[in-house]
Amino acid sequence: DDVELLDGAAAEFDLEKVRHGKLSPVFFGSALTNFGVEPFLEGFLRMTTPPLARMAGEAIIDSFDDDFSAFVFKIQANMNKAHRDRIAFMRVVSGRFDADREVYHVQGGKKLRLSRPQQLMAAEREIIEEAYAGDIIGVFDPGIFSIGDTLCAPGKKFQFDPIPTF
């Protein structure tokens, strides 16, 4: 009955507004009692976008482009308490990322070599050799990355539009 009240009181859900940062979905639940977990996961999957084109000013960077590009969406410190590390999470937008590849950090204005890229699942880490459009990877951050930073193939100089904030 309580859920019906929420459905009736809430405005119509609009996925496009979520994707453009104008609406933020709210889920209720408890992992301890397994209440609301399945609707959350189903909703998350429904709202998550596949690798899509992303705006970079007036240009559109298509996920099928051969040139590598990615954006930083999260930075997490102290994931490994023994090493006081800092990981920058990025989503590959286009092309292929290879370990030890040289990339251009647009905001920093310089080339970087990203070694030991990782895929993370909970507390587990796996060093990977390659990643493709749509993949999320973590790289060690010595303090040079910020949320929203653009990385791309050397010779390319574009900046992705900012990540929506609520």
Predicted regions and their residues:
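Structural and coupling elements of P-loop NTPases
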Residues: D1-F166
